[in-house]
Amino acid sequence: MREFLNLPLDASENGYKIDEMIALIHWIMFILAIGWSVFFYYSIYKFRKSNNPVANYTGVTTKTSTWLEVGLVVFETILLTAFAMPLWAERVVEFPAKEESTIVRIIGEQFAWNVHYPGVDGKFGRTDVLLITADNPIGIDRENEDAKDDVITNNQLNIPVNKPVIIYLGSKDVIHSLSFPVLRAKHDAMPGQLIPMWFKPVKTSLEVQNETIQTYDLTKLPATKNIILPKIEELTISAGGNLKNYILMENATKDGNDVLYSGMLLDADNVKALVDNSISKVKARKVNPVLQTLLTTEDYKDATGNILVPMGTPLIDDFVSMLLQNNISQVTARHKAKLNYFIYWEDYSSASISKGSAVTDLSLEQLKIAGIKNISIALATPIEMACAQLCGLGHYRMRGYVNIQTQEEYDIWMKEKEAELVASE
């Protein structure tokens, strides 16, 4: 069932118990769905009109249904008291001792996570909403003695492995929902409150990353296509016209003054501006939104050999216009590979690619040119801190990453951050 549900990787101490509960619930739902479906179709067949032309007003006379209901109540009581409530108590209610835990504050805002570490003294410094600025997102008072060694990071949570983490979660503006899928932890962030949540990581980020290593077959990249670019047309402008599907290919001028510029859409307002200035003819081309989803698979140069559009570049409007202005009407392109979240896990010296560098469409084309067919890749940041609040694209993009380190690595990182504080004074 876990494989069927495609649950995320697990790096927390109690994650497997949560996964077992999720799997159990789905098995129960599956069995109930089968059972109720069988009962439903049986009832349709058993009590069909042709077999029961006259209604029976007596109904069920046995106590079978009553006992079934009693059995269902007993089963659900056992499920709650023996499984759900103990797991909830162990995983959520029973907090570890503070002296044995890493303690941080995380304050959400539209649209970022601000992480506040108490520093060496273990005390959180004073914060004040009146001190909040772009450079001081939580309004920490650096004049306060407890705040002098406090470390603040943005969308980055560093924590040591094999040690409980207690997070005091809050929000500056609206309700957010902090989620750590790989750590099986999630809690809403409420404005004006600091709500505690906890988990215990048992794998480092590197160990989790090793579990994401996969081989990618470059022959499975989206197919390369020959793309015919839109033609440059000479359009006649008339009052009341709306040519919003067209984009200007040159400046529209009157008496040496520019009225509209190359690259502007010919919407109703711009058409009116042309009419008002007695401009009746312009050169333009149709806009094709599909082109912006494609990437060039080779370099395109002007007459003198200068590169206009490099290989691996999205065909946005500016580049399409540039190609057409240089008499290039056809290009080879493909759809994006959608490997933005991966890094290379090996060196590929023949394509000048080193281990740990980001997978880009340009580098994939370089690998193909070098004759490499299979590559080893892994997730760049396998452990995310995301906003699970279903309130639009801004919340969806409100993501950071978690770096789980050994205690020694964490101590070194913290000392580096503290040194940065001293240097900035």
Name each model feature, range by range.
Residues 22-50:
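Alpha-helical transmembrane segments
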Residues 29, 167, 263, 356, ...:
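Short alpha-helical segments in extracytoplasmic peptidoglycan/chitin-binding modules
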Residues 40, 66-73, 270, 319:
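Generic hydrophobic, aliphatic-rich segments that mediate packing or membrane embedding
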Residues 213-380:
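Intrinsically disordered, low-complexity regulatory segments
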